[in-house]
């Protein structure tokens, strides 16, 4: 399954990208689609088949599952 991960800050996205390089996860830093945010920002496109709890951290704001050109919100951080 493909996911797009949104973060509270761009620096958190960069930090997570560095984490990915040192892990077995497949992902890349991307500019966020306008459908998902009104602000300019970076996020992570992640290809992942396990339980999302393995990648969730306090820096993650939202996670969307990607199905073609559709996005389904599957995780939102508590406010």
Task: Please place each PLM-identified region on the residue numbering.
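Amphipathic, hydrophobic secondary-structure cores in small proteins
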Residues: 1, 21, 26-44
């Amino acid at each position: 399954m493909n996911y797009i991960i949104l973060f509270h800050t761009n620096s958190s996205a960069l930090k997570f990208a560095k984490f990915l390089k040192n892990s077995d996860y497949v992902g890349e830093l991307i500019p966020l689609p306008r459908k998902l945010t009104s602000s300019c920002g970076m996020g992570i496109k992640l290809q992942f088949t396990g339980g999302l709890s393995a990648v969730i951290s306090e820096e993650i704001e939202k996670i969307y599952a990607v199905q073609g050109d559709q996005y389904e919100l599957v995780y939102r951080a508590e406010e």
